[in-house]
Swiss-Prot record:
HAMAP family: GMP_synthase
Cited NCBIfam families: guaA_Cterm, guaA_Nterm, PRK00074.1
GO molecular function term, any single one: GMP synthase activity
Protein name per Swiss-Prot or TrEMBL: GMP synthase [glutamine-hydrolyzing]
Coiled coil: none
Gene Ontology CC terms, in alphabetical order: cytosol
Active site residues per record: 78 (nucleophile), 164, 166
UniProt-listed CDD domains: GATase1_GMP_Synthase (cd01742), GMP_synthase_C (cd01997)
Protein's job: Catalyzes the synthesis of GMP from XMP.
Amino acid sequence: MVLVLDFGSQYTRLIARRLRELRAFSLILPGDAPLEEVLKHRPQALILSGGPRSVFDPDAPRPDPRLFSSGLPLLGICYGMQLLAQELGGRVERAGRAEYGKALLTRHEGPLFRGLEGEVQVWMSHQDAVTAPPPGWRVVAETEENPVAAIASPDGRAYGVQFHPEVAHTPKGMQILENFLELAGVKRDWTPEHVLEELLREVRERAGKDRVLLAVSGGVDSSTLALLLAKAGVDHLAVFVDHGLLRLGEREEVEGALRALGVNLLVVDAKERFLKALKGVEDPEEKRKIIGREFVAAFSQVARERGPFRFLAQGTLYPDVIESAGGHGAAKIKSHHNVGGLPEDLEFELLEPFRLLFKDEVRELALLLGLPDTLRLRHPFPGPGLAVRVLGEVTEERLEILRRADDIFTSLLREWGLYEKVAQALAVLTPVRSVGVAGDERKYGYVLALRAVTTEDFMTADWARLPLEFLDEAARRITRRVPEIGRVVYDLTSKPPATIEWE
């Protein structure tokens, strides 16, 4: 396995994901993790991430210096390379000007660049620069702007690269990372089949004959977890709370798919309860609080009536764990708890089999477990459901309008082969009414916003460049089939500054 030491780079998670794509298990630790903690994980190699700081800052994050004499293979990326060079006696200088964007390696040599020929495009993002390698080290790559773009240790077990091999803008970056894994002798058995085998063993050993309670939303994480519990043969109850805020046909689709695959599923019809609690509420934060409160009440009632349960299973993913732990260069984002706010008298032990997995790895497991593509490849859907896509007060009438429009948009994306090319797509019903023409008469109808984004990690996202012909057909079909909607607009805002959801 490979440990990635995090010094605050926006790409740290991407490094870990890229390694797993190469079938090498990886974990992220804080950059200043002591040697004892590092060795506890028995890594076969270490990667020092980039970071936003300068190695000249007095309070810049630094690794335990004992790591450099540990004998472990090392790869320093950007800031990580500068730390490596500075610690081992090389020279790092404040660059005359920052180097950001695409660059070309005009020279590269050695096993780290095996299989690469000619000039190689890479992505730079640094201010300081290594101007001389440590004693005995060699310069193994350069660009026109940077004569020290990569360095190698005398024994060939440690390297530094000034660029970012993990990003898409370094097209041959995966080859460079793979070369490093081979040089380090890293075991590469992190396959979906191996992961599934390990998770089944873990769940069976942990749960034993005790009962497990799970809340399912119809999303890929909780649905896959329900299938895992069923395949493991543990005594479980999966609870699907229908809060009346679902998309068109969603309850029937989720219920049918999970029951067919052997999940012990209980569906709770709580539509009236939720809509009554939301009556007259327009503030988005208040809506979220009410929905959370009502969900907890419905879930708690099931737990008491059908209990006792020893474990509460959650589809917590590795990014949730990372965000909860915090790290260098970023404040702690949140304390993660998927089913937060449960009463204290409901005493559960948490069972989180996916706590070390990324979303794409869960999708791979879902494929092995037989989850239908309609659920496996489904776009993310917020816990509060359509309540945060109906701006203003949530009513059954407005929900029904949005359901029909959203279904048309999603169906069209599938028809055009675009659904799997965007990371998330949604329709938002605004409280704005716009004047239009129906026949010979003026008519006021709702303004509907369509949104689609592309992203790798949902931390940042770009608006999807859908064909104008597609958007034209979507607007025509929606206004024709949903007469309550008089105007359709398309959201061209990226994240940041906007969030993906409107509320």
